[in-house]
């Protein structure tokens, strides 16, 4: 009896054990199946994400390659820039350096603006301006917000251009940003002139810019600052003024300032020892100044006459050029080339003045002075 009970208990335990093992196997099998399906879904999702990011990476790489090609094209197009390896736009700003052009300066650069460079220039110029000026001195007047904003843009662009033209300025910055500053100066100046308010302040800013650029053009480079250039730095600043002179408001004042500088320089050379160390630099400066006046007159005088022309300013710089010619005449015994070049300038001026009927409104005495040189070339 007892043995049969023991066998029954043993059999019951074996069945319970088998049932437990079966349940465990089923549970394990179910968990393995669930895990494998989850892994499969994760794998498919991960593979899809990988393909998507791989496609994006390919698109980004193509975009980078395209931008690099555009940059190479931009650099290669700047054939005769001041620093060809660092050129970054297609404006041809320093083409025809020191060469007479048969067209109006500025046409080659029209519709070649690089929007990215323009935005970068404005940000950089404003950032540098904030370092120099306090907001307390630059408060905007609520009654004239547009005028003050454009006036501020003009001041910022002028300050930035003058900073670029300094002797210790970075070479690549000068070649990359100088034409951007010129473009912004033109845009702001035209808007300010069209507003017709407070032009005295605008004229003061422009005159200051011209004076500083002329000083930089005639400042000799120190021995330890000589840059590896094929042409004197003064000729690049000369070309910069020549570009700025395409705008009548700037060009006429540039001729006036340059002719005055020629008169002062001629007086200094008259009493200077020709063996003085600074004589060669002053001699070179004289030729650069005379050449610059000739460029401005030959390039722009006729186009200026077709625009809003300031006859009062015209009379002033005509008289100043005549006075400069007289000052140079005193140097004829020292260097007759000065007078020959100035006679050529006055001759070109007289020929162009004679072609423009609108100049008949100018004071006759002023015209008589310049027309007297019409036969001199």
UniProtKB/Swiss-Prot annotation:
A motif (Nuclear localization signal) lies at residues 117-124. InterPro entries: Msp1 (IPR037500). It comes from the Eukaryota. It is found in: Nucleus; Cytoplasm, Cytoskeleton, Spindle. Its main location: nucleus. Keywords: Cytoplasm, Cytoskeleton, Developmental protein, DNA recombination, Meiosis, Nucleus. GO terms for cellular component: cytoplasm; nucleus; spindle. Expressed in roots, stems, leaves, inflorescences and seedlings. Strongly expressed in meiocytes. The keyword Nucleus applies. Disruption phenotype: Defective in early recombination processes leading to the absence of meiotic DNA double-strand break (DSB) formation. Reduced silique elongation associated with fertility defects involving both male and female gametophyte abortion due to aberrant meiotic products. Produced multiple uneven spores aborted in later stages during anther development, due to abnormal chromosome segregation and unequal bipolar or multipolar spindles in meiocytes. Involved in meiotic spindle organization in meiocytes thus regulating chromosome segregation. Required for formation of meiotic DNA double-strand breaks (DSBs) during early recombination processes. This is Protein MULTIPOLAR SPINDLE 1. The lineage of its organism: Eukaryota, Viridiplantae, Streptophyta, Embryophyta, Tracheophyta. The gene is MPS1.
